[in-house]
Structures are given as structure tokens and as C-alpha cells.
A protein has these predicted regions:
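Short beta-strand/loop motif that positions the catalytic acidic residue
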Residues: 158-160, 164
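Conserved alpha/beta-hydrolase "acid-adjacent" motif
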Residues: 165-171, 216-218
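Cap/lid segment of the alpha/beta-hydrolase catalytic domain
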Residues: 63-90
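Structural cue for short, hydrophobic secondary-structure segments
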Residues: 33-36, 61, 116, 158
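A domain-start/cap signature at the N-terminus of enzymes
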Residues: 1-30, 42-43, 48, 57-58, ...
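Serine-hydrolase catalytic-loop signature spanning alpha/beta hydrolases and amidase-signature enzymes
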Residues: 38-40, 67
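Conserved acidic catalytic loop of the alpha/beta-hydrolase fold
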Residues: 93-111
């Protein structure tokens, strides 16, 4: 693992980067993994270990800045902002900087680039869907809701837990049901905890639901990685 320090405007931003340990055909896949509010890149790397589950990928775990949320109105803890338009949002600019550096170092491509995130980081994934859809091949938000962002039809792997009391499951369910309708998805079947959908154009969505709480569902990682690989 190495740590990048990037100048984004007048702010130094950090991200923790795992290089591929396994060769892939073509450009290496790239995953940006966004922690929840109050977290950091190192902790989410230890928690979900996407770099171990998908060793052929470049996996970047960025650090957020102190950010106001409903649960942290003073903005004392780090997270991600998606309430501002891209031109004034430091986090969107940080994403651009990471994507540019990854392209320069690893020859990554948007068609093989993915964003995942948990809680506040999952909400940020939905914001990227709305404001930077062409930079990503697919998204994997966890414990979040975001259909209000209304981005274009894109592949999604959504993780939700029925006993989540921070982002209540009924609100997450309303969000992904809205996305299913908007993107004209039809159910294709289930595999374990994953329900699969596809639209007439072949764009797919998978929804992983378990009985957990707001904590990240680590058992969702194999399905998430399989979904990413299926898009390459």
C-alpha cells in the first residue's frame, strides 16, 4: 500500500492505494472505495479489503474532509459532500485528481472504473452517478439512498440491511425501487441474498439484502467483486 498526497485547489488530499498483485487482460480495473462519515481510507481498507478480493484491480481508499451532515451539523468528522454542484465541490475535484493520477500511473480506463462506498460514502456514489456518470462503468453503494440524484441508466450493485437504523431500510428500499422503475429493470432471479435485474438494453442491477444493521455487510464483497468483473 502507498499513500498519495494530491493538491486539489489549495487543499492537500490523501488516498491509500493498493496496486494490482495479479495481472488482468487489458487495462487494470480501478475501484474508488469511499468510507462512511467519521471513517477514513485506512479503516475501510481493513474492513472490506477489496484489494484482496479483487487482486487484479487498482483499489483506492481516499480520505474525506470534515463535512457537515444531518448527524454532524458542526462538520467535526470526515466524510463526503454531495450537496454542491461539481464546480464548487472539493470532493468531486478530488475524484478527478485521483482518476487522472490512476490513468497516468496504471493506464486505467473509465470503462473499467468503479465506485463503491458505505453510508455517507454510498451517498457520494449516487452523487457521482448523477454528476460524473461517464467516469465510471458501475456503482456499488451500501447503506445509502440516492435515487433523487437521477443519473443515467448505469449498472448498480446495491447493498442494504433490513435492521439498519441509521439509514432505515424502508428508505433504502424506496430508493432502489424507484431506480428499478426508472431504469426499466425486470427481475431475473435470485442467488442467495442477491436479487438480479436487467433492462431491455442489457444493463444490470443486483441488490444484496441481509438482516444486519448499519455496519457494512462484509459477506456482500464476493458478489460485488463478481459484479464488477462481469462488467469488464
Amino acid at each position: 500500500m502507498e499513500t498519495w498526497t494530491l493538491e486539489v485547489g489549495e487543499t492537500k488530499r490523501t488516498a491509500h492505494v493498493y496496486k494490482p498483485t495479479k495481472k488482468s487482460e487489458g487495462a487494470p480495473p480501478l475501484i474508488l472505495a469511499f468510507h462512511g462519515h467519521g471513517g477514513n481510507g485506512r479503516n475501510i481498507a481493513r474492513s472490506i479489503a477489496l484489494h484482496e478480493a479483487m487482486p487484479e484491480a487498482v483499489v483506492i481508499y481516499p480520505d474525506g474532509l470534515p463535512t457537515r451532515t444531518q448527524r454532524d451539523p458542526e462538520g467535526a468528522r470526515p466524510g463526503w459532500s454531495y450537496s454542491e454542484l461539481p464546480g464548487s465541490n472539493k470532493d468531486f475535484a478530488f475524484v478527478d485528481a485521483m482518476l487522472a493520477k490512476a490513468k497516468g500511473e496504471f493506464k486505467t480506463e473509465p470503462s473499467r472504473t468503479f465506485a463503491m462506498g458505505h453510508s455517507n460514502g454510498g451517498g457520494f456514489c449516487y452523487a457521482l452517478w448523477r454528476f460524473k456518470p461517464d467516469s465510471f462503468a458501475g456503482f456499488a453503494p451500501s447503506a445509502a439512498k440516492g435515487s433523487r440524484f437521477g443519473g443515467p441508466t448505469k449498472p448498480f450493485f446495491i447493498v442494504a440491511s433490513r435492521n439498519d437504523t441509521i439509514v432505515p431500510f424502508p428508505e433504502q428500499e424506496t430508493s432502489f425501487k424507484d431506480m428499478i422503475a426508472r431504469m426499466k429493470m425486470e427481475e431475473q432471479g435470485t442467488k442467495g441474498r442477491i436479487t438480479q435485474y436487467a433492462n431491455p438494453e442489457g444493463v444490470r442491477m443486483e441488490i444484496y439484502i441481509d438482516g444486519g444493521t448499519h455496519a457494512f455487510a462484509k459477506d456482500s464483497v464476493p458478489g460485488m467483486v463478481a459484479f464488477f468483473r462481469s462488467l469488464l
